[in-house]
From Swiss-Prot:
Gene3D superfamilies: Queuine tRNA-ribosyltransferase-like. Homodimer. Within each dimer, one monomer is responsible for RNA recognition and catalysis, while the other monomer binds to the replacement base PreQ1. Binds 1 zinc ion per subunit. Pathway: tRNA modification; tRNA-queuosine biosynthesis. Zn(2+) binds at residues 306, 308, 311, 337. Belongs to the queuine tRNA-ribosyltransferase family. Residues 249-255, 273-277 are annotated as: RNA binding. Catalyzes the base-exchange of a guanine (G) residue with the queuine precursor 7-aminomethyl-7-deazaguanine (PreQ1) at position 34 (anticodon wobble position) in tRNAs with GU(N) anticodons (tRNA-Asp, -Asn, -His and -Tyr). Catalysis occurs through a double-displacement mechanism. The nucleophile active site attacks the C1' of nucleotide 34 to detach the guanine base from the RNA, forming a covalent enzyme-RNA intermediate. The proton acceptor active site deprotonates the incoming PreQ1, allowing a nucleophilic attack on the C1' of the ribose to form the product. This is Queuine tRNA-ribosyltransferase. InterPro entries: ArchSynthase1/Queuine_TRR, TGT, TGT-like_sf, tRNA_ribo_trans-like. The gene is tgt. It comes from Pasteurella multocida (strain Pm70).
């Protein structure tokens, strides 16, 4: 993988990721949003349908695919691309976040994490080396290092110990990745909680090891938005400009806009697909809660500005009807729309950066939703100063 940076507008960056795969050269235009395919599927969607929304790269979940179907089944198919029939780039997380979210079911040591398999209860072990081996078998185009996702809230001392162990695990991940002869990309993950001085140590340590890209982890885990914005404003300028920057597990449409404002290139989140199944649909001026009875006889499309299959063919009344009846098609049509909304948003962001009008786009984006534009935390600091 190589990253090409074309243009900047303020902190916002317009570029692309270029991948050489057996099927040819694939380009991912950035800033990019990656739909999440936890179990080797974007829920309810075929790969062709996902591609039709504009998606160029997907995220797979190492932890869940390791437990089911397992490495042996994956190897028999070739890799995850062959298994799920998506022959474009795939990024896989390392499994760290899922393991650490198990709470009392797991025990962390320097070697790795022992935990109880949530499917059958057996005790299993995941380490940086094992994570690299699983992701190698998955054939991931972008592999993520194994780290501890520092929880929120966390004391300075806990966040420091956690970040330092993640740095040691980053080196072990790098070493095993290289031993396997993996020719794909490996990303480091910056930790340190809400503490700027810890984030600085993490960035410097990871850059010293050397990675193909850098993710900002440990955000969107319950901290106030102001803290997320502050950390991004602090961390992004320290990441080498010629490497892609990935904000993990984020987020709402406004989070994507705010991430790009601060220099982020890549995002992933289950929100568009999960919210679709719960009847929360993203539109240009906010959210349509399709389960609301006011849509029972509404003959208008979800979003007149949207060009997705759902908006071109169906009314709000039909989507309300499908949801009310528990029809699977309702969840599918909702998912198509939400994924297309996210891809349209990213395309609009990219175009605005190209045309040197990103800040004007930000103003328009919030004006449509009737919300104020969040201030940059650095501006607040300078005002206070």
């Amino acid at each position: 993988m190589k990253y090409e940076l074309d243009k900047t507008d303020g902190n916002a960056r317009r570029g692309r990721l270029v991948f050489e795969r057996p099927q040819g050269t694939f380009t991912v235009e950035t800033p990019a949003f990656m739909p999440v395919g936890t179990y080797g599927t974007v829920k309810g969607m075929t790969p062709e349908e996902v591609r039709a929304t504009g998606a160029e790269i997907l995220l797979g979940n190492t932890f869940h695919l390791w437990l089911r179907p397992g490495q042996e089944v994956m190897r028999k198919h070739g890799d995850l691309h062959d298994f799920m029939q998506w022959h474009r780039p795939i990024l896989t997380d390392s499994g760290g976040f899922q393991v650490f979210s198990l709470g009392k079911l797991r025990k962390i040591t320097e070697e790795g994490v022992k935990f109880q398999n949530p499917i059958n209860g057996e005790r299993i072990f995941l380490s940086p080396e094992k994570s690299m081996e699983i992701q190698y078998d998955l054939g991931s185009d972008i592999v993520m290092i194994f780290d501890e996702c520092t929880p929120y809230p966390a004391t300075f001392d806990y966040a420091k110990k956690s970040m330092e162990m993640s740095l040691r695990w980053a080196k072990r991940s790098r070493d095993r990745f290289d031993e396997l002869g993996n020719k794909n990309a490996l990303f480091g993950i910056i930790q340190g909680g809400v503490y700027e001085e810890l984030r600085k140590v993490s960035v410097e340590g990871l850059v010293n090891i050397g990675f193909d890209g850098y993710a900002v982890g440990g955000l969107a885990v319950g901290e106030p938005k102001e803290d997320m914005h502050r950390i991004l404003e602090y961390v992004c300028p320290q990441i080498p400009a010629d490497k892609p920057r990935y904000l993990m597990g984020v987020g709402k449409p406004e989070d994507l806009v705010e991430g790009v404002r601060r220099g982020i290139d890549m995002f992933d989140c289950v929100m568009p697909t999960r919210n679709a199944r719960n009847g929360h649909l993203f539109v240009s001026d906010g959210i349509v809660k399709i389960r609301n009875a006011k849509y029972r006889e509404d003959t208008s499309p979800l979003d007149p500005e949207c060009d997705c299959y759902t908006c071109k063919h169906y009314t709000k009344a039909y989507l309300y009807h499908l949801d009310k009846c528990g029809e699977i098609l309702g969840a599918r049509l909702n998912t198509i729309h939400n994924l297309r909304y996210y891809q349209r948003l990213m395309a609009q962001i990219r175009q605005a950066i190209e045309e040197d009008r990103f800040e004007a786009f930000v103003q328009e984006f919030y004006a449509k939703m009737g919300k104020p534009v969040p201030p940059m935390q650095s501006e607040i600091k300078s005002d206070e100063g």
